[in-house]
Amino acid sequence: MVKIIECPRDAWQGLSQFVPTEQKKLYLDQLLKVGFDTIDFGSFVSPKAIPQMKDSAEVLNGLDLDNSPSKLLAIVANKRGAEDAAAFEEIDVLGFPFSISEEFQQRNTGSSIDQSFGRVEEIQNICEKTGKTLLIYISMAFGNPYGEAWDPEIAVNWSQRLHAELGIEVFALSDTIGVSDKKPMFLPCRDYLVVVDWKTYQNQCS
């Protein structure tokens, strides 16, 4: 089965001009009619980091969710953001950007990969208590522009550890820099498909 995550959040956060809250709501209401499996609509992170998404809580108010099969996903980067997002009944999925690039993880979340592993544990605990699903975006899954070691096995190995130690079951392989090629990822992922729910996500920021 093919499941599509639509991600207006990723496009919005790259815009310098603020998109009005009501305009975001109108657009999301149209997307909710399409039937996507999940819509990554917003983020609960510091507004200093991503000013465009400072209204994510307001955007939820008044969305027409009754007649849509789509689940709503919000990005979080730490325990506080997870607690804020999990308080909303409308949100089904919390997403955490877990990069296999040390450089990008520091830039994106202000934490090392090892520190981020600890954050994932905290967020997973919150999800389990509140009935949410935690999706891990494996950032830089298809390449690394910083000259660091990269191999498909690195993405798979981190995913295996997140699954085995923390019980994470849903992963999105994220093409952060737009260089995806399914061939190098196929063999490492093939034997692991029976264990976790893999999604592929062509994305420029997560």
Model regions and ranges:
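Distinct, well-ordered alpha-helical segments
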Residues: 52-53, 57, 83-88, 146-155, ...
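Glycine-enriched alpha-helix->loop->beta-strand junction motifs that scaffold or abut catalytic
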Residues: 35, 87-94, 166-169, 191-200
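Glycine-rich anion/phosphate-binding loops
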Residues: 17-25, 73-83, 108-123, 149-157
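N-terminal capping/small domains of soluble enzymes
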Residues: 1-80
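Alpha-helix-loop-beta-strand connector modules within alpha/beta enzyme cores
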Residues: 49-74, 115-135, 158-159, 185-205
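Glycine-rich, proline-tolerant flexible connector loops at the mouths of alpha/beta enzymes
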Residues: 37-62, 98-111, 140-146, 172-183
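Hydrophobic faces of well-ordered beta-strands that scaffold small-molecule active sites
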Residues: 2-10, 37-41, 70-76, 92-96, ...
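N-terminal small/glycine-rich loop or linker at the start of catalytic domains
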Residues: 1-16, 96-108, 132-146
